[in-house]
A protein has these predicted regions:
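Extreme N-terminal leader/anchor segments
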Residues: 23-100
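Cytochrome P450 substrate-recognition site 1
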Residues: 114-118
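Intrinsically disordered, low-complexity N-terminal tails
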Residues: 96-97, 104-109, 119
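Extended hydrophobic/Leu-rich segments
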Residues: 5-11, 43, 63, 178, ...
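Aromatic-lined, polymer-binding surfaces characteristic
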Residues: 107-111, 121-264
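Bacterial Sec-dependent N-terminal signal peptides
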Residues: 1-24
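Helix-centric, low-specificity signal for extended rod-like, repetitive segments
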Residues: 12, 37, 57-59, 124, ...
Length: 264
């Protein structure tokens, strides 16, 4: 094998293994959408013809072309970022994630992100990791600077989180239990990653992140389908696992209404 060919092989290999999971088209997204909604005629026609790759491209074009979108949590025409959020965004690029103000400096979760890393055995630290508090600052940093590195890394981390945090069915009462050390792996992890309160946080924040990163080349048609399928999974999960009472229930219900009214 000559040096040039060897270099190409190694580079190709690095592209596949060095940055985690590749984005993939989720054709089930079309069954979750109202394809009779005004503006989605091309999407519907392409999907019915079995051209889902083209349909996904048309769907992304539709979202990017909209001009009447209101995002209550941020003014897209006047995006600013403070020093603290800029730090969270820059640290996030290196997988040093701002999770909790009570645990500073923030912890690094590894080049190959370990979403189950638990440096201090405090449930709040593990729960709040899954609120992704650095994602919106990364979006602001992207829009203010125009630097694609923020969008590229966000898309990578978003897909990485999906792949490494599968939703395992469990009784909703288990989400609030203190770990006794007997439950391990995915079953233990789902208690933290998919607790309804954390899911509702993501449900609200991702409406803002969607708009912030939408113009990016890293926001591909395939990524769009993964995003929408995951977003739908979040909403369905909350509907089946509302907290019984208290402020958690209030927040979960509020964010469901919020997500519906935003109409991604």
């Amino acid at each position: 094998m000559n040096k040039t060919l060897k270099y190409i092989v190694l580079l190709t290999f690095a592209c596949f293994v060095g940055k985690g999971y590749a984005q993939e088209l989720k054709s089930e997204v079309f069954s979750l959408l109202n394809l009779d909604y005004p503006g989605l005629e091309k999407v519907k026609a392409l999907h019915q013809e079995g051209k889902d790759e083209d349909a996904a491209k048309a769907l992304l074009d539709y979202y990017r072309a909209r001009t009447n979108v209101k995002t209550p949590d941020i003014n897209l025409k006047k995006i600013t970022i403070g020093k603290e959020e800029q730090q969270w965004a820059d640290d996030g690029l290196k997988h040093t994630f701002f999770v909790h103000k009570g645990y500073q400096p923030s912890y690094n979760y590894g080049e190959d992100i370990n979403w189950q890393y638990w440096p201090v055995k405090d449930n709040e630290l593990r729960w709040q990791l899954h609120r992704h508090k650095w994602f919106t600052p990364m979006g602001k940093a992207y829009r203010v600077s125009g630097d694609e590195k923020y969008a590229k890394e966000w898309a990578y981390q978003y897909i990485d989180w999906i792949k490494k945090n599968p939703l395992v069915k469990m009784d909703k009462k288990e989400y609030e239990l203190v770990s006794d050390g007997k439950i391990k792996g995915e079953v233990e992890n789902v208690r933290f990653a998919w607790r309804p309160l954390e899911v509702s946080n993501r449900l609200q924040d991702q409406t803002t992140q969607f708009q912030l990163f939408l113009p990016s080349p890293s926001f591909t048609p395939d990524f769009l389908t993964e995003f929408l399928v995951n977003y739908h999974k979040h909403a369905v999960h909350i509907l089946a696992n509302y907290s019984d009472q208290g402020n958690h229930l209030l927040f979960e219900a509020q964010r469901m209404i919020y997500a519906w009214s935003i109409s991604l």
